[in-house]
Amino acid sequence: MALRIAFMGTGNFAVPVISKLYNNKFVIEKVYTKNVNKNIKTPVQVFAEKTSIPCTNVSFMDDVSLFKEIQNLKLEAIVVVAFGRILKKNILNEPKFGCFNVHGSALPRWRGSAPIQRSILAGDRETGVTIIKMDEGIDTGPILATKNATIENSDTYTTLENKLSQIGAELISENLIKLSQSETTLKKQEETGTTYAKKISKSESKINWETSANQILRVINASNPSPGAWFNYKGERIKIFEAQKIDKVGNPGIILDSELTISCGDNSIQPIQLQRAGKKILNINDFLLGFKFSVGEKIN
């Protein structure tokens, strides 16, 4: 018997999950998304409209109204992915089996809103996806399923998000059915090894040329596409979205050659994709056509 569920999600990470549930014949009674900009549809909104699933924007909906609507749906479960809103206890307890979150890390490491970016920034070699039954804490609920994934040196926030969302889609689809049929159980989440993943700030994404080339690459990858790793050059903020490590040395922050190789605390990096303020992202060759600098200059 297909499970009757609601889906709560907003960003790109949520789309493969709702797509998998839809294709696996879950009965998605309602989709909820959070969108403060009425002129731009969220990725989940787009999917809901394409598949003719009723969709509500909760940005302008109070908790009482949301609960009453959930109550009337008589759901067996709610799946929550990259939603952007904390659910009250009465909503968490309303569905027959509960509310389940697809989280982009191997919990309890990186509880919080930015687990994928934090895992890259910290230099983790491995991360994962965890399905938890939600409680009132921040990613503290019991674990339904988890699966690890390798972080490649080339992984950006976007590529790792894509990888983990596919894993999460498989995990939730398979294990939610198992739970409803009493073929699996929940496991209490450990507290040992807990870390917290707060949102990456613009100040954190500023490149510190005193640090190693590897660390700078992690900042670039974790900040791609948002907020974008950046540096100042003659008063202008320039963002780097992709770069490579180069085996050259020099004082940190010095432009070493005509290809804009910049020295770091050890070795150097060469940007591959950059963006000037208010301009579009360009590859290094096109960028250099309109960007003048002098070899030997120090970047702020």
Regions from the language model: what does each represent?
Residues 1-225, 267-270, 276-278, 300:
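One-carbon transfer enzymes
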Residues 210-300:
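An anion-binding loop in the catalytic cleft
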